[in-house]
Amino acid sequence: MTHTLYYKFILGYLLFGFLGFVTIATVSSNLTYEHLIEQKAEALYDEATMIADNCSKVYEGKYLDLATAYPQLDAVATYMKARIWIMDHSGIITADSSRKAAGTAVEGFDPTAQGNRLYTIGRYYGMFDSDVLSVSSPITGNMNTYGYITIHLPISVIKAEQNGFLNIVYITSGIIFALSLIILLIF
């Protein structure tokens, strides 16, 4: 009688560990990913808005030299692990933080496609080989929209950060699971 109860207890313990791992792998993974997407989108949008405000000063009579703007774009892009584009209203990239796409036209560019969402996820009109998180902010002046600041963060960067968080959760749950072995020692 005691052995069968003990085996059932061990089986229940192992089942609990397995279901805990599956729960962490699915629920925690999705929650972490969604949280990181929202967090990164807000940070990118704030940065895009700040850059757009600086670019808008040109239309208030102030001078903006692209030669002096590039180091700032490059520094922000490097810090955020993203690419920053300055685009005109028709979708032609006038400046690129990586200096690869300047002068390129974004085919099918539609600034209203984003709707009221803060961000989009995809390949941004086929301009990237993998999915990116993209945000854009208009460059306005004198009640007109002259262009857009778009910032693109590779989803792989977000996935790497997600995996880092999940590793911490896995290790912590493994330690808790191991510490709960004390219950088996008591019986």
Regions found by a protein language model. Give the residues of each.
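Extracytoplasmic/periplasmic sensor domains and loops in membrane signaling proteins
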Residues: Y70, I92-S130
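Helix-start (N-cap) segments at beta->loop->alpha junctions
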Residues: Y59, T140-N142, T150-Y170
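Short loop/turn motifs at secondary-structure junctions and domain boundaries
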Residues: A75-Y79, G126-D131
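A short beta-strand signature within small-molecule sensing/ligand-binding domains used
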Residues: F128-T140, G147
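Juxtamembrane segments flanking the first transmembrane helix
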Residues: T2-I92, S98-A101, A160, N167
